[in-house]
């Protein structure tokens, strides 16, 4: 979350000192009241959120009629996706103070990456014919092949002592956690 929820902004007391005597953001604008946080605390040095998403869809097909009544259609549907999300909540951010303001437990960064691809290849053969000009028949055969693959990784770090690291220095975090997953499935149908 980049800053307070909208209801926090709507119910905030409009009194207090937004800046201290040095011109810095005052985290607690109402003196002696730690329940109200300054809604202007997040800036580029103490909070970041970045997302990248790419999706590619491909759907080529071919349809051939080699003789009267016979058609063959072949279709390929493919999808490639990639997403990456980076987040950083550092010393001095709104969420840092909201969580308690402890550098060892309330500063964190996360990188999440998801990649997947899948495709489906379908072949459809159809034959139309008449018998004695009064009966019309249609025969259809279908085959399908599909393949799905996904891998996900997530890296998190808690206890980041310096805001300059953002998510790029997770090895410097006091507590690190990494996880990954992979799944694949294939199928054929007639």
What would you call each of these model-derived segments?
Residues 63-68:
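Long hydrophobic segments that form regular secondary structure
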């Amino acid at each position: 979350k980049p800053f307070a929820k909208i209801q926090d902004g709507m119910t905030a007391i409009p009194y207090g000192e937004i800046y201290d005597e040095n011109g810095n953001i005052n985290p607690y604008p109402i003196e002696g009241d730690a329940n109200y946080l300054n809604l202007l605390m997040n800036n580029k040095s103490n909070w970041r959120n970045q997302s990248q998403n790419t999706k590619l869809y491909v759907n080529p097909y071919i349809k051939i009629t080699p003789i009267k009544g016979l058609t063959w259609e072949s279709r390929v549907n493919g999808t490639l996706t990639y997403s990456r999300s980076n987040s950083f909540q550092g010393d001095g951010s709104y969420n840092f103070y909201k969580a308690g303001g402890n550098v060892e437990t309330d500063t964190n960064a996360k990188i999440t990456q998801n990649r997947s691809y899948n495709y489906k290849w379908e072949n459809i053969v159809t034959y139309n014919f008449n018998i004695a000009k009064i009966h019309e028949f249609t025969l259809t055969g279908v085959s399908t092949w599909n393949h799905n693959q996904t891998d996900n990784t997530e890296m998190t770090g808690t206890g980041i002592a310096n805001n300059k690291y953002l998510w790029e220095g997770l090895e410097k975090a006091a507590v690190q956690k990494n996880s990954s997953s992979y799944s694949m499935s294939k199928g054929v149908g007639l």
